[in-house]
Amino acid sequence: MKTITIPYVEYKALRVNPSLAGDLTDALQEKFRKLTRLEQVDEEGDLELVVEVTGYDVKATAITADEQAAQSRLTVSVKIEFTNRKYPEDDVSQSFSAYEDFDATLSLDSVEAGLCETIIDKLVEDIFNATVAQW
């Protein structure tokens, strides 16, 4: 294995975060650049990692006695298709999700960037471990 293709992450979630796909793409490319000797190519790599964001949701997770949300949770879900052109038995098709909780009295806008950064870190680690960490 000498090359990997990591195309731009597709965003298919209903709720929109305009920077998430780009940030996740950059983080994945950086992780593979730092921790592997694989050369990143635009197409036809020995390995290919296709990622799509399938969910971006905020839900209340803790309710107070007066039925107000005390904590909210931002969850990001992704689906990956990892193709190993030399060893197809190592192909991976899997879904991952990661979340972060935040104080429900805060607006999502005020905490979203920091939450997404942490969530992206978790997702990238999970994806890396599921695809090439066993080498």
Q: Residue locations for each model-derived region?
A:
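Compositionally biased, intrinsically disordered linkers/stalks adjacent to structured regions
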Residues: 112-135
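A structural "domain/chain start" motif
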Residues: 1-26, 30, 35-37, 42, ...
